Design a protein with these regions (language model features):
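Catalytic cores and adjacent binding grooves of peptidoglycan-active enzymes
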Residues: 63, 68, 72, 76-130
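Extracytoplasmic cell-surface/polysaccharide-interacting catalytic and binding patches
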Residues: 1-38, 115, 126-130
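Generic alpha-helical scaffold signal
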Residues: 22-29, 48, 52, 68, ...
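Compositionally biased, low-complexity repeat tracts
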Residues: 14-16, 44, 55, 65, ...
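Feature targets compositionally biased, intrinsically disordered low-complexity regions
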Residues: 17, 47, 59, 94-96, ...
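Amphipathic alpha-helical interface surfaces
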Residues: 28-31, 41, 54, 70, ...
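Extended, low-complexity, intrinsically disordered C-terminal regulatory tails
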Residues: 33-59
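Solvent-exposed, flexible loop/coil residues
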Residues: 13, 26, 53, 58, ...
Length: 130
């Protein structure tokens, strides 16, 4: 299978940590690249595509956008996290999850483009973890 290479993001960042598969949605990745270009700073992806099995094994939601290739978690904190959230809202990301608790190296912002029709709840939606 030919793997699409995405500007700014490595295969290792995007692949499922359980199976090694990469099944990112092309429209989602186009929007993520646009965010990265507007941010004008590197973005470290800590979680990209997840198989259903891997998602279940880490306690992910059965409706997770990660299993559809429509989400990433970006490792960031402080002003960078703020700027990512601001740009994500401007660019129309539908799901923004904020985890800014604990050590800085564990903090992240979840970004997804899953719509109300897919998940069955109102979108856009912003939430915090913990």
């Amino acid at each position: 299978m030919m793997i699409k290479r995405w500007k700014y993001f490595s295969e290792d960042e995007l692949r499922c940590k359980g199976t090694g598969e990469i099944k990112m949605n092309e429209e989602f990745m186009t929007k993520l690249i646009e965010l990265r270009e507007k941010l004008n700073q590197p973005m470290i992806i800590t979680s990209g595509y997840r198989s259903e099995e891997h998602n279940n094994s880490i306690g992910g939601s059965y409706k997770s956008a990660h299993i559809r290739g429509l989400a990433v978690d970006v490792g960031c904190s402080g002003a960078k996290a703020y700027n990512i959230v601001k740009l994500a809202m401007e660019l129309g990301f539908q799901g923004i999850g904020i985890n800014q608790h604990g050590p800085h190296e564990k903090r992240f912002i979840h970004l997804d483009t899953m719509t109300s029709e897919v998940i069955g709840v109102s979108r856009p939606w912003i939430w915090s973890y913990k």
